């Protein structure tokens, strides 16, 4: 329920200025196999309780009919529930960042780019941060807010916070010396065909589609079995990328957490880009879902893509204040969609406690107030 409420708040921020954020409010669909039916039903119940509009379809035949009503070539197997969220959607990343930049610059905020943070100056027993050291000089500060995506590990270490923690699980058992951070390799790519290839039967832009199923997945290239285990993909037509953009469930990075090289990030990394098996798996999964994608492997965009995400022990964000005046937004790879979190953090720093942020405090690990474990192959679902 906590993540549901936080996301509903962020969706309201996206909806507040769709043009500036390049936001497309087409909705979102969670299309799932039997293993996930109860979880998805619970999500629907929780959404209804907070007024977040969604439709829940149960049963294999009912789910197939619902999907065929949207896509007449729908052919995914093993689907027994569909959650169709009417709010939500996606945004064009670069344009959204440009829109955000304009908003803060118009408010008179100083934005300093291309600057490396080298350390912090602290004082007092609580190690309050009084200044930020950079390669261009020192910046004095009253409060420090860190929202740094996968680089949170490095700032966490700079501030002197523990790299391992004690954690009480949902059964009440205590686990010691658990890594605070773990990295997952993100699998993303683009099928270079006209985005209009993926429209609904009535010619409209569809919701963002997320499919999790345990039906066997066979190669669209040679018919060989790719997996008979639970697998998942998401996809959408994207005019920013010029094709069908999406990804598959990530996999864990086995490198010891403090040895993971975050830079260079994304496509420039020699170590952390989408795996060599990803393109065939993802395009085959698209073909598993829609007949229109059969034989589309030659259209896969072959340049490196993807990146890594930095996750907390329960894969949900940590948003809390440390050392008296250091607020950390550790997004646990939820970051981009959590547009409204900055607003909530700002309100807290001005003295107004935010109920929406309470379930995301660091203390939850020791207290055993963890977020639920997902049955999806996606750790952030």
Please annotate each region the language model reported.
Residues 2-16, 42, 46, 99, ...:
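A non-catalytic, amphipathic alpha-helix used as a structural packing/dimerization or gating element
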Residues 15-16, 20, 24, 35-107, ...:
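Flavin (FAD/FMN) cofactor-binding and adjacent substrate-gating region
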Residues 120-273, 295, 379:
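Flavin-dependent oxidoreductases
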């Amino acid at each position: 329920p906590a993540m549901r409420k936080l996301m509903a708040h962020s969706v309201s921020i996206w909806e507040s200025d769709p043009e500036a954020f390049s936001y497309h409010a087409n909705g979102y669909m969670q299309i799932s196999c039997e293993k996930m039916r109860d979880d998805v039903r619970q999500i629907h119940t929780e959404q209804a309780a907070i007024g977040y509009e969604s439709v829940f379809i149960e049963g294999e035949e009912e789910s197939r009919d619902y999907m065929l009503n949207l896509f007449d070539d729908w052919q995914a197997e093993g689907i027994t529930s569909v959650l169709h969220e009417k709010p939500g959607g996606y945004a064009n990343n670069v344009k959204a960042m440009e829109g955000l930049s304009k908003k803060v610059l118009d408010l008179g905020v100083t934005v300093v780019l291309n600057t490396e943070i080298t350390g912090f100056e602290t004082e007092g027993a609580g190690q309050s941060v009084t200044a930020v050291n950079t390669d261009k000089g020192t910046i004095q500060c009253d409060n420090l807010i860190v929202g740094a995506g996968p680089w949170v590990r490095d700032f966490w270490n700079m501030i002197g916070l523990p790299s391992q923690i004690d954690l009480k699980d949902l059964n009440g058992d205590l686990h010691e010396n658990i890594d605070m951070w773990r990295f997952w390799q993100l699998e993303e790519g683009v099928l270079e065909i006209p985005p209009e290839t993926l429209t609904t039967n009535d010619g409209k832009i569809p919701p963002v589609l997320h499919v999790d199923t345990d039906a066997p997945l066979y190669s669209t290239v040679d018919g060989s079995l790719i997996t008979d285990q639970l697998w998942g993909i998401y996809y959408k037509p994207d005019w920013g990328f010029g094709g069908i953009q999406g990804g598959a469930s990530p996999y864990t990075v086995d490198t010891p957490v403090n040895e993971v090289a975050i830079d260079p990030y994304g496509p420039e990394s020699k170590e952390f880009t989408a795996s060599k098996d990803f393109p065939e798996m993802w395009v085959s999964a698209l073909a598993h879902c829609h007949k229109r994608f059969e034989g589309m492997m030659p259209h896969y965009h072959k340049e490196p893509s993807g990146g890594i995400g930095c996750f907390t022990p329960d894969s949900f964000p940590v948003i809390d204040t440390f050392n008296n005046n250091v607020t950390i937004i550790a997004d646990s790879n939820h970051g981009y969609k959590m547009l409204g979190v900055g607003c909530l953090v700002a309100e807290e720093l001005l003295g107004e406690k935010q109920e929406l942020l309470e379930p995301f405090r660091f203390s939850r690990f020791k207290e055993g107030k963890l977020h639920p474990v997902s049955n999806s192959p996606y750790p952030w679902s």
